Amino acid sequence: MHRALLNASRRVATVRSMASTVEGDAFRLSEYSSKYLGHRKAAFTEKLEIVNADDTPALPIYRVTNAVGDVIDKSQDPNFDEQTSLKMYKTMTQLNIMDRILYDSQRQGRISFYMTSFGEEGNHVGSAAALEPQDLIYGQYREAGVLLWRGYTMENFMNQCYGNADDLGKGRQMPMHFGTKERNFVTISSPLTTQLPQAVGSAYAFKQQKDNNRIAVVYFGDGAASEGDAHAAFNFAATLKCPIIFFCRNNGYAISTPTSEQYGGDGIAGKGPAYGLHTIRVDGNDLLAVYNATKEARRVALTNRPVLIEAMTYRLGHHSTSDDSTAYRSSDEVQTWGDKDHPITRFKKYITERGWWNEEKEMEWQKEVKKRVLTEFAAAEKRKKAHYHDLFEDVYDELPLRLRRQRDELDAHVAEYKEHYPMLETLQSKP
């Protein structure tokens, strides 16, 4: 009798222990999920296994067309009308022609600096077309096509590259550092990656203001993704659930550093899920795919779920006019990419097969754009430069005494030594 009671007591204790264990495990898993894992479900395991990064499958590359421009799955074709399609093509080719002329002009010493977008025209136009005018854009320095799509004029481009008095930035920035409040494009700054956390801040402000049909979009390259500010921005956006799209142009090189020396994981997109970002990798030379991906990303971002897009592309040009890429890559590599996978060539086939484009129209358009670029270039070259008084303006509503004194001292200096300042004749009249 005593032994039976003892065994029964042990069984009850065992059941209670098991119940307590189950309850304890459930408690811990619930706590881990809500407090540590972003509400993701996890389970305990008794199998010791370290995740092998080399065995983790890479994220797929979304595409609509193949390398020669054929639509693979008709259901993925956004079916643009003729007007929209031609605007897309003309924006890409206009950018390409402008790049060629301004690059050559820098080599002639007529402007001080330039950066081309050769080979990346598709991700500019495809993404810009999927956004809304009210969306706030933070660019890096290779997004001229986004501005073209938004209506930034050829005159604006030329004035900025010359830094003349009609430049929207009053000549205070080096070439390629565009910005326009009217087009919701924040002025570009030179320090790498600073725009990412700034863009997240803007997106957070939209969320706080309950601006329900506006997002922030920030463009950056693979090199910028290696900077600490990128990781801070990813975490900031995911934690605060901001309406933002991170658009990474992975073009293979951070100036001279190839991507193989920048990261050991699954590219830039591979970082997204780890930070809690909704993520897609897209063929950046496929305008249709970039458009679809960006449009869907915008829909998701509007629900306060940040999205990372990695656009796989290739930089056909040098990093800038200060770079000679033949020092770190072969001309054969560049030629092969240009011949086998160019976004303009791919989309040209798309519109040609629909009867919207032909070689005669191509020749007429090329001639028209070259004339327009050269005309605006010549006009910008002749315009006066901003007066040096502008150095003191646009910070304070009313110029403080110390700045007025500095301005007056500069006036006195220039008046005394004006023979040493021949450029005074090229300046706009004193305000």
Curated annotation (Swiss-Prot):
Q: Which EC number(s) does the record attach to this protein?
A: 1.2.4.4
Q: Which biological processes are named by the entry's GO terms?
A: branched-chain amino acid catabolic process; fatty acid biosynthetic process
Where can this protein be found? Answer: Mitochondrion matrix
Q: Where does this protein hold thiamine diphosphate?
A: 140-142
* Entry cofactors: thiamine diphosphate
User: Which EC class heads this enzyme's classification?
Assistant: oxidoreductase
Q: Give me the reactions it catalyses.
A: N(6)-[(R)-lipoyl]-L-lysyl-[protein] + 3-methyl-2-oxobutanoate + H(+) = N(6)-[(R)-S(8)-2-methylpropanoyldihydrolipoyl]-L-lysyl-[protein] + CO2
Q: Which residues bind K(+)?
A: 189, 194-195
UniProtKB keywords: Fatty acid biosynthesis, Fatty acid metabolism, Lipid biosynthesis, Lipid metabolism, Metal-binding, Mitochondrion, Oxidoreductase, Phosphoprotein, Potassium, Transit peptide
Q: Which SUPFAM superfamilies match?
A: Thiamin diphosphate-binding fold (THDP-binding) (SSF52518)
The record's Pfam families line, in alphabetical order, gives: E1_dh (PF00676)
Report the pathway entry: Lipid metabolism; fatty acid biosynthesis
One function term, GO molecular function aspect: 3-methyl-2-oxobutanoate dehydrogenase (2-methylpropanoyl-transferring) activity
Q: Could you give one GO CC term from the UniProt record?
A: mitochondrial matrix
Q: Which family does it belong to?
A: Belongs to the BCKDHA family.
Role played: The branched-chain alpha-keto dehydrogenase complex catalyzes the overall conversion of alpha-keto acids to acyl-CoA and CO(2). It contains multiple copies of three enzymatic components: branched-chain alpha-keto acid decarboxylase (E1), lipoamide acyltransferase (E2) and lipoamide dehydrogenase (E3). Required for the production of the monomethyl branched-chain fatty acids (mmBCFAs) isopentadecanoate (C15iso) and isoheptadecanoate (C17iso).
- The protein here is known as 2-oxoisovalerate dehydrogenase subunit alpha, mitochondrial
